[in-house]
């Protein structure tokens, strides 16, 4: 007997039996220890053999443990030597003889089990007493191996390789576990056509992620099950190869190749009845490749070329080009079947087809408007993924959200129960008091508590009844699903009596019951129908784009948007109106979907409110004045700096980091983008903007298309400022627009200007405007001081003084800020530090005799 002729699993079993003996303080290793070790092996081979021979592994393992406990324990200080018994050596020798007699080069674990069944020791008796004879084991081994010989050290890995490393898709179709496949007839027909060829009958499905490549295979499996395929494929089974299971645990060199060869061998023996499906086909290229070893694709090539292997691959366009096309010999053995993204109409049909499966899983109902919304809204707003996958995800998440809400207590009932708890706590505290007021309060609260508890009981009963109704509906739908699967099976097996009973008796009866429960009073506490607004709400959460149904308060807010913006931007009514109209168009849903929500060029002198209006707009839309993407164009004066916006080109530092502009918009597609001081940038930068303004998209350095259709783009410039500054007070800006545009046309190309929604001129601020701005600035200071509990007051003379002294037509409102810092904030800072102004005091600002006075009132 040569121990080197035992397989790795057999050696492991022998080693483990030594550990079992040591653990139990036994001095000898007996066949019983070896049997216990075999029962612990993890390949599942022993369990299969025991089951096929009419035994039960769990019962046998318990009996072995009982016998192990009967063996006397010998405890030796410092540990003693454990000897192999003569019986054990006889069993191993018999296993070696059995292997040789059956033409095996290596002794496997099943031969050791067979050798134990011949044994007259306790181990052998346990097997025979449970009806597991050597003859039965020999027959089970033959059935398991299917005539294969053990000629490698890891021979056990090749048994039932397809079952171990594959998933039977046709079996899933038979048991009704696959979703129905709608459409894709052309792709399935082309796949069947390639599979029916004599040579190179291997289609590869190529398409973007999420377009339904795997679904086509499931559709083909369903057609094979229903015999809706040519005769050549009627008896075929589709087995999906599990690459993870194939690679996992392949420790030794050549073990992976051995497993793959075992899979291919079983497919070859099936005489064309097994079609191998390899999802993510590109993983085969290079898998298992080590020094001197072949990768998986090279093992497949001979069988693929000869037509001995029916194989369907699936991969994406990028990975097909990157991995498979580079290996021309591998690529030519496959016939590409291109799977395009379905249209919105096709997606709606697909969603209608799988609707029942999702309703059954989540125990909710899906309205048709939700299906249409999922297809149309996902196509419009989720641009970095593909239909139908992104639409199915929306439906799934909306159903999941509703299911969670259904299982939770309704908000109305929850508030009621919380109020009851609050009153009970209040009553417990009041009962300790004895005064008259407390007694009256107790009476009042007791009456309120009785009323609330009665309402809570009624509402809880109603809620429980509604939950029971929904659970009843769910059970009926599950029954209907099972009945339909049984009907398909009965029709396939030509069991006409059962088919007619199901078709004309059981199924109509269940459908009638479902209809009755659905038609019952639906105005309850629980909402169980997924609607269009639920889908819109999910998209809003994913993208940040507010497309869910507007509340009446938001509608009113949008109608008075100009007033809100005028609170912080003074004297620029024309600009405010243009921006407000753009926002209202987008929220009303009548905006051109292929362009940004609005694109504006703000022209005017410094300090008149160009940047301030952009901040006010961000504050209105997002409740955060800083929620804008501000790009200072003075940083892009050199030509090479332009690439920072879309990312560095390949080969340059920072290529993998993405662009400043594109990455920010990808992460937050709904925002205000401000290109400040745009005339200072290099002229070539406007070539990038042409695509954004016209098509609402831009491709970054890595080839990813970024969607700008939900952004508001604002460009500010000081071009023509001297004309606007010298304009007469109160004169309409349109009178000088032509003069300003001459300056603008000298800097910007006509194709750029033509793509802007509006070019807005900001006129210079007058004395009245400055007065209003002073008030806003002092209100801001008042808010800052209130945080320190200091009250700031100011009168009209102070406002007039600051407005008059801070007014400069050439510089707008900016000198005003410096004046307030100099005249008020500097003096206040000194007073606070000196302790003159402290918490609770009032600071009053007034003006007397052309001088600003700061008074402190206790």
From Swiss-Prot:
Binding of ATP 2, residues: 604-611
Major localization class: cytoplasm
Stretches the record annotates as NBD2: 554-764
Regions that span the bilayer: none
Gene Ontology MF annotations: ATP binding; ATP hydrolysis activity
Domain spans labelled Clp R: 3-147
Region called C-terminal, residue ranges: 765-858
Compartment(s) where it occurs, according to its Swiss-Prot or TrEMBL record: Cytoplasm
NBD1, as annotated region: 160-341
GO BP annotation list: cellular response to heat; protein refolding
Pfam families reported in the protein's UniProt record: AAA (PF00004), AAA_2 (PF07724), AAA_lid_9 (PF17871), Clp_N (PF02861), ClpB_D2-small (PF10431)
Region (Linker): 342-544
Region ranges (Repeat 1): 6-71
UniProt KW keywords: ATP-binding, Chaperone, Coiled coil, Cytoplasm, Nucleotide-binding, Repeat, Stress response
GO cellular component: cytoplasm
Region annotation Repeat 2: where it falls in the sequence: 84-147
Listed PANTHER family: ATP-DEPENDENT CLP PROTEASE, HEAT SHOCK PROTEIN 104
Family of the protein in this entry: Belongs to the ClpA/ClpB family.
Record function comment: Part of a stress-induced multi-chaperone system, it is involved in the recovery of the cell from heat-induced damage, in cooperation with DnaK, DnaJ and GrpE. Acts before DnaK, in the processing of protein aggregates. Protein binding stimulates the ATPase activity; ATP hydrolysis unfolds the denatured protein aggregates, which probably helps expose new hydrophobic binding sites on the surface of ClpB-bound aggregates, contributing to the solubilization and refolding of denatured protein aggregates by DnaK.
Protein name: Chaperone protein ClpB
Organism: Rickettsia bellii (strain RML369-C)
């Amino acid at each position: 007997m040569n121990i080197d002729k035992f397989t790795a699993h057999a050696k492991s079993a022998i080693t483990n039996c030594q550990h079992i003996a040591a653990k139990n303080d036994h001095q000898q290793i007996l066949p019983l220890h070896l049997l216990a070790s075999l029962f612990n092996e993890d390949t599942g081979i022993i369990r299969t053999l025991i089951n096929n021979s009419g035994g039960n592994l769990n019962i046998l393992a318990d009996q072995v443990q009982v016998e192990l406990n009967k063996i006397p324990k010998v405890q030796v200080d410092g540990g003693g030597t454990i000897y192999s018994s003569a019986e054990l050596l006889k069993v191993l020798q018999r296993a070696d003889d059995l292997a040789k007699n059956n033409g095996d080069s290596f002794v496997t674990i099943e031969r050791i089990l067979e050798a134990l069944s011949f044994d007259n020791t306790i181990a052998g008796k346990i097997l025979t007493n449970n009806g597991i004879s050597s003859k039965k084991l020999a027959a089970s081994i033959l059935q398991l191996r299917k005539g294969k010989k053990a000629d490698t050290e890891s021979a056990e890995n090749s048994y039932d390789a397809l079952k171990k490393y594959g998933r039977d898709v046709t079996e899933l179709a038979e048991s009704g576990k696959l979703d129905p496949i709608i459409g894709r007839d052309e792709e399935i027909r082309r796949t069947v056509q390639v599979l029916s060829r004599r040579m190179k009958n291997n289609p590869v499905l190529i398409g973007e992620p999420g377009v339904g490549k795997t679904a086509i295979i499931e559709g083909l499996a369903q057609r094979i099950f229903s015999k809706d395929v040519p005769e050549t494929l009627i008896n075929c089974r589709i087995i999906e190869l599990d690459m993870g299971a194939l690679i996992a645990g392949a420790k030794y060199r050549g073990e992976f190749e051995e497993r793959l060869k075992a899979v291919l061998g079983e497919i070859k023996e099936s005489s064309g009845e097994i079609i191998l499906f390899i999802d993510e086909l590109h993983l085969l290229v290079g898998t298992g490749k080590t020094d001197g070893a072949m990768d998986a694709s090279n093992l497949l090539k001979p069988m693929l070329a000869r037509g001995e292997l029916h194989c369907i691959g699936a991969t994406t366009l990028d990975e097909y080009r990157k991995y498979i096309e580079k290996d021309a010999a591998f690529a030519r053995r496959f016939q590409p079947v291109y799977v395009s993204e379905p249209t919105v109409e096709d997606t709606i049909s697909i969603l209608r087809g799988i609707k029942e499966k999702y309703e059954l899983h989540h125990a909710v109902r899906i309205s048709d408007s939700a299906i249409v919304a999922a297809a149309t809204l996902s196509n419009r707003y989720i641009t970095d993924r593909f239909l139908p996958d992104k639409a199915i995800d929306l439906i799934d998440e909306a159903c999941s959200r509703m299911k969670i809400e259904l299982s939770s207590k309704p908000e109305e009932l929850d508030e009621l129960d919380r109020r009851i708890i609050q009153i009970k706590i209040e009553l417990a505290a009041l009962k300790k008091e004895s005064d008259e007021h407390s007694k009256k309060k107790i009476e009042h609260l007791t009456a309120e508590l009785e009323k609330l508890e009665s309402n809570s009981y009624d509402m809880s009963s109603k809620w429980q009844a509604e939950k029971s109704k929904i659970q009843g509906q769910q059970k009926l739908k599950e029954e209907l699903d099972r009945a339909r699967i049984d009907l398909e099976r009965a029709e396939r097996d030509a069991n006409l009596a059962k088919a007619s009973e199901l078709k004309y008796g059981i199924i109509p009866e269940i459908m009638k019951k479902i209809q009755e429960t659905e038609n019952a009073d639906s105005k309850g506490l629980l909402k169980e129908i997924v609607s269009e607004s639920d889908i819109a709400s999910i998209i809003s959460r994913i993208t940040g784009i507010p497309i869910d149904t507007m509340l009446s308060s938001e509608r009113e807010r949008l109608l008075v948007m100009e007033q809100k913006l005028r609170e912080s931007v003074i004297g620029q009514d024309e600009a405010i109106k243009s921006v407000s109209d753009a926002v209202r168009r987008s929220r009303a849903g009548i905006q051109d979907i292929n362009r940004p929500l609005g694109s504006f060029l703000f022209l005017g002198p410094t300090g008149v409110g160009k940047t301030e209006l952009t901040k006010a707009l961000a504050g209105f839309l997002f409740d955060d004045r800083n929620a804008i993407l501000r790009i200072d164009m003075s940083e892009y004066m050199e030509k090479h700096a332009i690439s920072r916006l879309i990312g560095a080109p390949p080969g340059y530092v920072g290529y993998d980091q993405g662009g400043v502009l594109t990455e920010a918009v990808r992460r937050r597609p709904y925002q205000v983008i401000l290109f400040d001081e745009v005339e200072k940038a290099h002229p070539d930068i406007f070539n990038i903007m042409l695509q954004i303004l016209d098509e609402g998209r831009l491709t970054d350095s890595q080839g990813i298309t970024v969607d700008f259709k939900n952004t508001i783009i604002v460009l500010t410039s000081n071009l023509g400022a001297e004309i606007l500054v010298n304009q007469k007070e109160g004169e309409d800006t349109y009178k000088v627009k032509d003069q300003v545009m001459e300056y603008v046309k000298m800097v910007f190309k006509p194709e750029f200007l033509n793509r802007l929604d509006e070019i807005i001129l900001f006129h210079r601020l007058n004395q009245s405007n400055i007065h209003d701005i002073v008030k806003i600035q002092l209100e801001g200071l008042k808010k800052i001081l209130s945080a320190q509990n200091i009250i700031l007051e100011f009168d009209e003379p102070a406002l007039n003084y600051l407005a008059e002294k801070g007014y400069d037509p050439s510089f707008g409102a900016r000198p005003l800020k410096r004046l307030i810092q100099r005249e008020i904030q500097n003096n206040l800072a000194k007073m606070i530090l000196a302790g003159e102004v402290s918490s609770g005091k009032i600071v009053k600002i007034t003006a007397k005799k052309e001088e600003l006075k700061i008074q402190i009132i206790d």
